[in-house]
Amino acid sequence: MKRDLYETLGVQKNADEKELKSAFRKLAMKYHPDRNPGDQESEKSFKEINEAYETLKDPQKRAAYDRYGHAAFEQGGMGAGFGNGFAGGGAHGFSDIFEDIFGEMMGGRQRRSSGGRERGADLRYNMEISLEEAYSGKTAQIRVPTSITCDVCTGTGAKPGTSPKTCGTCQGTGRVRAAQGFFSIERTCPTCGGRGQTIADPCTKCHGQGRVVEERTLSVNIPAGIEDGTRIRLSGEGEAGLRGGPAGDLYIFLSVKPHEFYQRDGADLYCAVPISMTTAALGGKFDVTTLDGTKSRVTVPEGTQAGKQFRLKGKGMPVLRSSQTGDLYIQIQIETPQKLTKRQRELLQEFEQISSKENNPESTGFFSRMKDFFDTLSE
């Protein structure tokens, strides 16, 4: 029996893309054939890891696996409850499985019912927001051009006063069988195009499609703490279904614009702040404006070194759907003076002359240890 793909990668079933990639890289490094030459078990594990990752990183393949397990990818192989034949007795064949799944996923093929009803396609809308908007959350108005149910024929596709008729070729199934040698092949009905119905007198507004294109304005609630790459689903806001079929969904893909001052890592924020050499040496204070619009004071003690971090607790990003908040880390950068005047140069030279080892313990100790090291080598 094949191993569970999530178990193979060592992740939970709700693992996100980042967790999948991290687990894959870690295991791939461990079992890579170049690191384990001649080890057949490692080679086998490496192949299993690759297969698991290739399946789970693809949203459609992952949905197929979650629903049907390994049976979704086995030609002619049926999972429990799928029946015995590939195309006989009303059982789902390999292609039918994918029609069921992908008809519900991101614009895949829709499976037609015997009444000619088709589910509308899912739609994607890309939205870019600022870090400030991700911090506070917002309700955004978006305009989406999409197909909606025709208001003249109410989605039937037929002229008012008439109705679609059951296709006489396929008897409403949308599929016909044709014998070819020893095989019986099922294909889309050429008369109705797989809809199971024919329209003798189509609606003049939608031309028999049952829907028309229109731009709609929708409200999208973006919660505080939303992260870059988050997907928001608006159920039933995709394309209208055909001939009374259910509407698809609208997926909002969010991207957060890079910020001029802040970098984000989960719920924590990082900001590099340059200070003068004298402030670092003598100490000082400065204010930082945080994303909530308030100012926080940072106290720099004398002798502060470059790279020193100060933590402002609770001044980071809100955690999505939680009362918790991340922290803001201020990283100190020391700016070396440039374009010195003659007097400034003289003062710095004088400072250098009167400085002692105690003023610069790190550099003094470093060069002393380096000298001792090379002296030892030359002995």
Swiss-Prot record:
Zinc finger boundaries on the chain: CR-type? 137-215
SUPFAM superfamilies the record matches: Chaperone J-domain (SSF46565), DnaJ/Hsp40 cysteine-rich domain (SSF57938), HSP40/DnaJ peptide-binding domain (SSF49493)
| Family matches, as InterPro entries | DnaJ, DnaJ_C, DnaJ_domain, DnaJ_domain_CS, HSP40/DnaJ_pept-bd, HSP_DnaJ_Cys-rich_dom, HSP_DnaJ_Cys-rich_dom_sf, J_dom_sf
The residues listed in the UniProt record as binding Zn(2+) 1, with positions renumbered to this chain, are 150, 153, 203, 206
Q: Which cofactor does it need?
A: Zn(2+)
One GO BP annotation here?
Answer: chaperone cofactor-dependent protein refolding
Annotated Zn(2+) 2 binding sites: 167, 170, 189, 192
GO MF, one annotated term: ATP binding
Query: Could you tell me which Gene3D superfamilies the record lists for this protein?
Result: DnaJ domain (1.10.287.110), Heat shock protein DnaJ, cysteine-rich domain (2.10.230.10), Urease metallochaperone UreE, N-terminal domain (2.60.260.20)
Q: Where in the cell is it found?
A: Cytoplasm
Q: Which Pfam family would be a valid example here?
A: DnaJ
Looking up SMART domains in the UniProt record yields: DnaJ
Give UniProt keywords alphabetically.
Chaperone, Cytoplasm, DNA replication, Metal-binding, Repeat, Stress response, Zinc, Zinc-finger
Return the CXXCXGXG motif repeat spans. Answer: 150-157, 167-174, 189-196, 203-210
Give the note describing cofactor binding and stoichiometry.
Binds 2 Zn(2+) ions per monomer.
Boundaries of every J domain copy: 4-69
Where does the protein principally reside? Answer: cytoplasm
Provide one Gene Ontology cellular component: cytoplasm
UniProt similarity note = Belongs to the DnaJ family.
Q: What interactions and quaternary structure are annotated? A: Homodimer.
As for what it does, the entry says: Participates actively in the response to hyperosmotic and heat shock by preventing the aggregation of stress-denatured proteins and by disaggregating proteins, also in an autonomous, DnaK-independent fashion. Unfolded proteins bind initially to DnaJ; upon interaction with the DnaJ-bound protein, DnaK hydrolyzes its bound ATP, resulting in the formation of a stable complex. GrpE releases ADP from DnaK; ATP binding to DnaK triggers the release of the substrate protein, thus completing the reaction cycle.
Domain text from the record? The J domain is necessary and sufficient to stimulate DnaK ATPase activity. Zinc center 1 plays an important role in the autonomous, DnaK-independent chaperone activity of DnaJ. Zinc center 2 is essential for interaction with DnaK and for DnaJ activity.
The protein in question is named: Chaperone protein DnaJ
Q: What is the originating organism of this protein?
A: Rhizobium meliloti (strain 1021)
Q: What is the gene name?
A: dnaJ
